[in-house]
Amino acid sequence: LQLAGFDIAKPAVRLAAKALPAARYAVASSFSQPVRTGWADLLLNCFSPFAQEEFQRVLRPGGRMIYVVPGAEHLYQMKAVLYDTPYKNPVQEVAYPGFRAIGEREVQGTITVPHDQLEALFAMTPYYWKTPRDGTARLAALPELTTDIAFRFLLFEKL
């Protein structure tokens, strides 16, 4: 079994390498993975854009991909702090040419994030780039945040 992992964030790659040293890691984009064509039996893509052409290239015929996207309630309470009108994430049924959807599962829970980790969590979200300053200030003032988390695991097979 050979494992490889890629992320555009160098700290994430370092953390993964410490957690599972038997795998190989690289700082790389989903759109340009440093592996040969047809190398992968399974891809796991978490909260990254769907790089369809690159996934097609990297997966062997019949290979599978788990695509993790946020569920409707993911970080809803964080959005309630950041925005005057919080919103649920859209849940869409998607079809990608060259892939066949073969399953889906949603996992939900609640987490409490201490103050010293709130900024790091916030920085990993798209909200970081589009939140007004007053919303950012409200989040920074919290001693902790309890929020829902929701992940949709979409399973695809390469045709």
Feature names for model-found ranges:
Residues 1-33:
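Class I SAM-dependent methyltransferase SAM/SAH-binding core
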Residues 47-61:
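A short, conserved alpha-helix within the catalytic core of class I
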Residues 14-15, 35-38, 75-81:
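Short, charged, surface-exposed secondary-structure boundary motifs
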Residues 72, 79-101, 107-159:
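Conserved Class I S-adenosyl-L-methionine
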Residues 41-45:
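Hydrophobic beta-strand segment of the Class I
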Residues 62-75:
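Conserved beta-strand signature within the Rossmann-like core of class I S-adenosyl-L-methionine
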Residues 10-11, 50-53, 73, 113:
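Short alpha-helical
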